[in-house]
Amino acid sequence: VIVDNFSNSKPEALNRIKKITGKDFAFYEADLLDLAALEKIFEENKIDAVIHFAGLKAVGESVQKPVEYYHNNITGTLMLIKAMRKYGCKKIVFSSSATVYGPVNKAPYTEDMPTSATNPYGYTKVMIEQILRDVYVSDNDWSVSLLRYFNPIGAHKSGLIGEDPNGIPNNLLPYICQVAVGTVSYTHLTLPTNSRV
C-alpha cells in the first residue's frame, strides 16, 4: 500500500515503480493530516508495518514557513500513529535526518549523541523521533526504527525513478542534475554558511 498526497511528487512515479517491480499495489491519494482517510486505508488493508517518508523537507522553506512545517510534519505523524495504534499496527520505520545531530556534534556521528537542530525542519525530525521513543516507552510491543541519513542521491539503474521533485530541487545534486539535462536553467548558486557539501 502506498499513500501520497503528491505535494512534492508525481503520479507517474507509481507506474514506474510497477514497471520496475513487476508488481501491482494499492494506492491512496491522501494526506496524513486526514485521520479519517488514514483510518479508511487501515480498515481496507491488512497493514503490518509502516515506512514513513511523508513530510515537508526543505530547510530554507521551513525557516520561512515554520508553522506549516510543524503542523504538517508533526501533526501528520501523530495522525498516522493514532491510526496505526487503532488498527494494531505497531511497526514503524521513520525517515528522520542527519540534521538531528545539529551544529555541535562532529563527524563521525554516533546514535548516542545528543540531538538538536538549527531550523524548523530539523526540529520536526527531533520532535518526531522523541514522540516515537515515547510511544515505544508507553508500549514496548512497538518496533521503532529511525533512519538518520544525509541527502540521499541517485536513481534506479533503469533511470525510471530517482529524485524528481515538483519545481526546483532544494538539494544541490538534484539541482545540478536538472541543470545538466536542461530541466532548469543555470543560476548563480549561493550556499548557506552551514552547508555540508
What kind of feature is each model-predicted range?
Residues 13, 34, 168, 172, ...:
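Alpha-helical structural motif
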Residues 82, 151, 174-181:
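Generic alpha-helical structural context detector
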Residues 126, 139-142, 154-174, 183:
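Glycine/proline-rich active-site loop of Rossmann-fold NAD(P)-dependent oxidoreductases
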Residues 147-149, 176, 189:
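Generic structural signal for nonpolar/small residues that stabilize regular secondary structure
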Residues 187-193:
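Conserved small/polar residues in nucleotide/adenosyl-binding loops
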